[in-house]
């Protein structure tokens, strides 16, 4: 097992104590700068082509409010404080900002992301890897409860990004397994949660071991005094972006889930539903444009009359399809999140999330269709084993309970 660095090596306890005293005595830059630019599409943000490919492949079509405001300043290298509820797309915001700036020819740790829990760190790692799939990003989660030796082996082989919990990351820094020489970006995710768990000292410990010039991003649902202390100590003229949660409601909409276990069982489940229920009009949401086309084809080969619309179609075609759907000449519409906010059909009695949304905030915009104008509606969510975490996050985000679909669902429509 690797030992801690001896006296005289890179980790110098006396120098550490001296730097920590300087840090705690410093008052930092206690002011914010404003940043008002809003980008309505990912294409307008000036991102690398292969990053855009990863974003679209992951299922994002239109940036959320925090992404519209927060990705570009991070990409520009500015220190940022982004305050928004969990589930609004913060993770993809800083992941995109990091992925845009990495030097992929240099296989050294250039970005460090701290998260309060092992589960969140592993979730961030998964998103980072997915968005950076076409860029060849090397990312690793350093968290407690896993093999220290395995962490050391992976770090020695080289990574671009480390995501981790404060305890394990500090341990890796102390052991010199994680060398901060090339580190340019430092992100604190769910900063308020991290501070409430007592990680303040460890965050300070880690920060003062990083290079002097490092870009800092702080992401948090709330901004308690301790979080503001961090911004004062570590950040230079940070851009502050505040996004409030949508003031929409799920009232009057009955929400259920169907445990389909595996992705390949969704189609049979969907067809069974349409054969047993008398549905006036319904909307089916999937996460990618390609899947819209695939599902439309599958439904039509089984003699279901469906319409489909997504962002690759020109506006004129989309308008014609929507007119047909509103008039009732087509009863089933298959679409993506991009169009969720524009479907204002009163007669829609059922929304089916064939895929759960990639961000909890989009759930509201999808199923809100069926409850507009005081009409009641039903939302049915198809849930695979991999979706269970997202279903939990959605229930927590909206403070709702989504029950398993009962056998008498026909009586509810």
From Swiss-Prot:
A motif (Q motif) lies at residues 40-68. One of its GO terms (molecular function) is ATP binding. The keyword Ribosomal protein does not apply. A motif (DEAD box) lies at residues 189-192. One of its GO terms (cellular component) is cytoplasmic stress granule. The keyword Transferase does not apply. Residues 71-241 form the Helicase ATP-binding domain. Keywords: ATP-binding, Helicase, Hydrolase, Initiation factor, Nucleotide-binding, Protein biosynthesis, RNA-binding. GO terms for biological process: cytoplasmic translational initiation. It catalyses: ATP + H2O = ADP + phosphate + H(+). InterPro entries: DEAD/DEAH_box_helicase_dom, Helicase_ATP-bd, Helicase_C-like, P-loop_NTPase, RNA-helicase_DEAD-box_CS, RNA_helicase_DEAD_Q_motif. Pollen specific. Belongs to the DEAD box helicase family. eIF4A subfamily. This is Eukaryotic initiation factor 4A-8. It comes from Nicotiana tabacum.
């Amino acid at each position: 097992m690797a030992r801690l660095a001896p006296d005289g090596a890179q980790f110098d306890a006396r120098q550490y104590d001296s730097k920590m005293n300087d840090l705690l005595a410093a008052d930092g830059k206690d002011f914010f700068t404003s940043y008002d630019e809003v980008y309505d599409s990912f294409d307008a943000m000036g991102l690398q082509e292969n990053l855009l490919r990863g974003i679209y492949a992951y299922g994002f079509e239109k940036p959320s409010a925090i992404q519209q405001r927060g990705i570009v300043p991070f990409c520009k290298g500015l220190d940022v404080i982004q305050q928004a509820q969990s589930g609004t797309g913060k993770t993809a915001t800083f992941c995109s900002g990091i992925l845009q700036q990495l030097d992929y020819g240099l296989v050294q740790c250039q970005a460090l992301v701290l998260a309060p829990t092992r589960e969140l760190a592993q979730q961030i790692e998964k998103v980072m890897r997915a968005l950076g799939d076409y860029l060849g990003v090397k990312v690793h989660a350093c968290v407690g409860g896993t093999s220290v030796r395995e962490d050391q082996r992976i770090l020695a082989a080289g990574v671009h990004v480390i995501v981790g919990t404060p305890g394990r990351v500090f341990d890796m820094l102390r052991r010199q397994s994680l060398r901060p020489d090339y580190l340019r970006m430092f992100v604190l995710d769910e900063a308020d949660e991290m501070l409430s768990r007592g990680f303040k000292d460890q965050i300070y410990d880690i920060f003062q071991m990083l290079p002097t010039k490092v870009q800092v991003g702080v992401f948090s649902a709330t901004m308690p005094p301790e979080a503001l202390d961090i911004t004062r100590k570590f950040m230079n003229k940070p851009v502050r972006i505040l996004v409030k949660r949508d003031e929409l409601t799920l009232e009057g909409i009955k929400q259920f889930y169907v445990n389909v276990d595996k992705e390949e069982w969704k189609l049979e489940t969907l067809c069974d539903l349409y054969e047993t229920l008398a549905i006036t009009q319904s909307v089916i949401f999937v996460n990618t444009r390609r899947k819209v086309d695939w599902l439309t084809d599958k439904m039509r080969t089984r003699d279901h009359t469906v319409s489909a619309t997504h962002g690759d179609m020109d506006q004129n075609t989309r308008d014609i399809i929507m007119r047909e759907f509103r008039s009732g000449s087509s009863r089933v519409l298959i679409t993506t999140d991009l169009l969720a906010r524009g479907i204002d059909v009163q007669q829609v009695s059922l929304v089916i999330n064939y895929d759960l949304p990639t961000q909890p905030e989009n759930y509201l915009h999808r199923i809100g269709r069926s409850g507009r104008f005081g009409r009641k509606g039903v939302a049915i969510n198809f849930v695979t084993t991999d979706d269970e975490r997202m279903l939990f996050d959605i229930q927590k985000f909206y403070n709702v309970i989504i029950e398993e679909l009962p056998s008498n669902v026909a009586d509810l429509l």
